[in-house]
């Protein structure tokens, strides 16, 4: 059993985690204060029925944000090494930006960026 050390580490860390969680539950301050019962920054009431559906617009805007955030993370290394890249590297990035621009134009035309619909 060559992984005995890892097994012992997992058992010790699991036991310690359970002990700390239990101590926090037993010794923790349980009286709600004004910050705990107030409405969050997003405007949702913490004691409201959690079964209320979210608008699909929230998810659409979130997905669009992720797509364009990833675009920036892909473009940063290219921008750092731009002068050392051959012409092929330039055209690959231009194709990438063109495809993303087409996607943005499509979303714009379909009304995905308008909140009022």
UniProtKB/Swiss-Prot annotation:
User: What Pfam families is this protein classified in?
Assistant: Oxidored_q4 (PF00507)
TM spans (from-to): 6-26, 58-78, 85-105
The record's catalysed reaction(s) read: a ubiquinone + NADH + 5 H(+)(in) = a ubiquinol + NAD(+) + 4 H(+)(out)
Which molecular function terms from Gene Ontology are attached?
A: NADH dehydrogenase (ubiquinone) activity
Q: Which compartment or compartments is the protein found in?
A: Mitochondrion membrane
- What cystine linkages occur within this chain? none
Q: How does it sit in the membrane?
A: Multi-pass membrane protein
Alphabetical keyword list = Electron transport, Membrane, Mitochondrion, NAD, Respiratory chain, Translocase, Transmembrane, Transmembrane helix, Transport, Ubiquinone
Q: What is its EC number?
A: 7.1.1.2
Protein role: Core subunit of the mitochondrial membrane respiratory chain NADH dehydrogenase (Complex I) that is believed to belong to the minimal assembly required for catalysis. Complex I functions in the transfer of electrons from NADH to the respiratory chain. The immediate electron acceptor for the enzyme is believed to be ubiquinone.
Which family, according to UniProt?
Belongs to the complex I subunit 3 family.
Report what the protein is called.
NADH-ubiquinone oxidoreductase chain 3
Identify the taxonomic lineage of the organism of origin: Eukaryota, Metazoa, Cnidaria, Anthozoa, Octocorallia
The encoding gene: ND3
